[in-house]
Each structure stands twice: as C-alpha cells, then as structure tokens.
UniProtKB/Swiss-Prot annotation:
Record protein name field: Small ribosomal subunit protein uS13
Role of this protein: Located at the top of the head of the 30S subunit, it contacts several helices of the 16S rRNA. In the 70S ribosome it contacts the 23S rRNA (bridge B1a) and protein L5 of the 50S subunit (bridge B1b), connecting the 2 subunits; these bridges are implicated in subunit movement. Contacts the tRNAs in the A and P-sites.
PANTHER family per record: 30S RIBOSOMAL PROTEIN S13/40S RIBOSOMAL PROTEIN S18, SMALL RIBOSOMAL SUBUNIT PROTEIN US13M
Record gene name: rpsM
Organism in which the protein naturally occurs: Kocuria rhizophila (strain ATCC 9341 / DSM 348 / NBRC 103217 / DC2201)
Superkingdom per UniProt: Bacteria
NCBIfam families listed in its UniProt record: uS13_bact
Chain segments carrying region Disordered: 91-122
Molecular-function GO terms, alphabetical: rRNA binding; structural constituent of ribosome; tRNA binding
Sequence similarity: Belongs to the universal ribosomal protein uS13 family.
Gene3D superfamilies named in the record: 1.10.8.50, 30s ribosomal protein s13, domain 2 (4.10.910.10)
One GO process term, biological-process aspect: translation
Length: 122
C-alpha cells in the first residue's frame, strides 16, 4: 500500500483519483502534481515504482500544505476569527452558515435537526 502525506492510497485506483484522497489535494492539484513529476495519471497506484513514489512525496510535501498542517491552519484561522469577534467568528460560534446563506429555511446541516416550537393557540 502506497503512503503519501500520511494517507494510504487505494491500490486499485488510478493515480489521478487516488491523490485526491489526501486532504488538501483535489482534482486540479492532482493533475498539476502529475504534470510536474511527469507521471501518467492513468497508472494504477499498485503499479507505481519506489522512485516515482519518492518523487510524488517530495513534490507534494514541498509545494503544498496538506493533511495535518492544513487542518491546523484552517482551525487556527477559525479560532482567530472567533477570538477577534468578527462577524464570521460569531457565525462559527453560533453554528450558523458563515458565507451569507439564507437561514429562514434550509441551513439544516449547520443548525442541526429541526426543533419544533409550540404553535399559537386559537
């Protein structure tokens, strides 16, 4: 099993897809990485040679912030916004959508399950 940036890549998948299992590497970055290292995206992970793995590992760790480092940075950014009391920090603290989405309806992912409020008596 090939390990890159602390992630076990699925052996049967094409390299182009397998790289996206790394947090911080999407389709675009995977293609950029393959182009820069000169490795074909059609190669299966199980068919990679050790020098190719080393080259991929060096390129990803040298050029991108991925996995733990990226998660820590994102968490620190959110923590900073909460501490300085910005609007976005307030939305994070209250568990509401941060980027201006509507909340009268929808936003159930951020707000959690619906809490029923007693209706007005006639």
């Amino acid at each position: 099993m090939a390990r890159l940036a602390g992630v076990d890549l699925p052996r049967e998948k094409r390299l182009e897809v397998a790289l996206t299992y790394i947090y911080g590497v999407g389709r675009t970055r995977a293609l950029e990485t393959l182009e820069a290292t000169g490795i074909s995206g059609d190669v299966r992970v199980k068919d990679l040679t050790d020098p190719q793995l080393v080259e991929l590992r060096d390129y990803i760790e040298g050029n991108y912030k991925v996995e733990g480092d990226l998660r820590r940075e994102v968490a620190a950014d959110i923590r900073r916004k909460v501490e300085i009391g910005s609007y976005q920090g307030l939305r994070h603290r209250r568990g509401l959508p941060v980027h201006g989405q509507r909340t009268k309806t929808n936003a159930r992912t951020r707000k959690g399950p619906k809490r029923t409020v007693a209706g007005k008596k006639k």
